Amino acid sequence: MRRIGTAPSVCYSIVCFLLGVAYPQQPPEFESLLASAQQAQARGDFEAAGEFYRKAVAAHPEIPELKANLGLMYYQTGKDQKAIEAFNLAIRLKPDLFVPNLFLGIEYVKLKRFNKAIPYLKRAAQSKPTDAQAQLGLGQAYAGIGNTRLAIRSYLRANDIDPQNADVWYHLGVAYLEQVEADARVLLTRHKDSGFVQALLADTFAEQHAFLQAADAYKKALSLDSFPPDTHANYGFVLVNRHDLSSAEHEFNTELASNPGSLMAMLGLARLHLERGEVEESVKEIAGAFKADPGFLASNASRFSAGLAPEKLTELDRVLEQRQTSGATPEDLLALFRNVPPNQWSFEAPKMATGADKSLASNATGFYKDGNYTQCSDALAPRLETLPPKDLRLLATCAYLSGNTRTAFETARRLAASSATEAEGLYWETKSAEQLATGALARASELDSSSPKLHILLGDIYRQRKSFPEAEQEYRKALTLKSDDTGALFGLSLALLADGQTDEALHQAQAALENNPDDPELNAVMGEILCARSDFAGAEGYLKKSLNTKPEYFPHVHALLGKVYAQTNRTQEAIAELRLALADDKDGHIHYQIARLYLKIGDRDSARQAFDVSDRIRRQGLTRAAVAMQQGDEIEPQ
């Protein structure tokens, strides 16, 4: 995590207080010590400033602000234990003093003593509610103890105070992703046979273009007693991508039969019309969805366009432009399909509602049935904390579908708090947290566009989520700022490889290795690229050179070496390498590979055991990393 860097400005305010207000009758020697401390501090000489403060504390041990400033100098020079001692002494003299509480909490966060940090950071936040750093530190402490929801609340408060702080946006985005993982664990443990879990699994497969697996998961979800609204429509989109248009039409119409206001089904029919060359009919459906709820279409226009042939998109654009010129459709409708940034739309994007209106609330169900999701959300959101479960379900649905993911997330939290609606609540919390994470991380990137480190961190997160184009974009931003950054080159090569751009990945890895021929991580990625190109003989040397890589990459390198040996008929060596990778098998494919090798040498008992473990890991694999697993190394093309 990136270190909070506000100590100098806080110190300065205390020095001014000491010099100008608190102790006007001090001897000249004492005043000189404080002035010297301030001067050293202003020029960044924290060692010297600390020595002056130490002498001042010796002269006046009863002044808590002096001890606080001494602690800050220790903090700035990395003397953590001395800083903690000084802050504690200041707090004993004046328990509510803001600075020592804040920085003692920050020190404990830095040392991963999160439970000790929380009370100090809470006290700092209470004594100075407008300080973003107190809320940011508190969020980090809550995240450290695994209380992701409280962490998110603290980050949101920090964001309200300082919306231009890239650190806050970054931590908020990461916290949302951690909430997704936490929800996945609960869903897997308590609700693995729920229609909401199967629908979530299907949604994830669909996002990864694993349409065969998505179809199976949607069918399973639809066979259960309850499942999310629009599941038939979502299944229809998968069938469109598999070019089964008649079955897709059946699913869209089935959705409309039970859910007449489904804009997702309407959008699906628009996609069907376009696939069949019925452009005017497609535009009518799109215009109808936009009229009902612009926020819905803004959130789903990219989904509508995904996988469409370029010529069909061109024809759609032509007809939309003609209708816009004639006044038949609004200007913003065309903008949605041209990827115009939201800040250039003329219609107002949905926001979290505030004012209560009981007459609107009574009409929420009617709004939903008409596809007016934003109006439905606005009607219910002001009473979120008092709504009964039936209305919470409706609010979560309407808020998410209208693109108001902040409200959807808060509503889902309430649903998840009850055992009767936990699975449904976690479904909506996961869906909305994914969207919120993407938005927060993108905002962090915009605000701190000059930081290669942040772009690399964002690239890593996108790559882990299998959002490879976004990952590539972040790595390239980092390389624009620092062309020889090894971390960016490493991440970019992996993202390109995972996205099927093997030649470009090879080009990037080769360029990186020219400057860093002995870098173990770059050698590892070069070995992986050559494995993907079936150049196992070429890969072997690079992989052996990468065996002194970071511990977190160690199992993966052994798994790749195992693959090299297996493909070059060195079965025993392959088994030995794969054994070293088994402990890190998150999706079951390494156990599957070693099981096949055991069969090859006639060891059926070991093979059966490895197959059993592979199956168990697969069944448990709800997280994004596990969802992508197939009985080979990658999802098969579909």
Where are these regions (language model features)?
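Helix-start (N-cap) detector for alpha-helical repeat units in TPR-like alpha-solenoids
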Residues: F30, P64-E65, F98-V99, A132-Q133, ...
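Position-specific recognition of the canonical hydrophobic site in helix A of tetratricopeptide repeat
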Residues: Q41, A68, Y75, R92, ...
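Structural marker of alpha-solenoid helical repeat scaffolds
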Residues: A59, L93, S127, I161, ...
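Canonical tetratricopeptide repeat
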Residues: N69, F103, G137, H171, ...
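TPR/TPR-like (Sel1-like) alpha-helical repeat modules
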Residues: L156-D162, Y170-E178, R190-H191, L267, ...
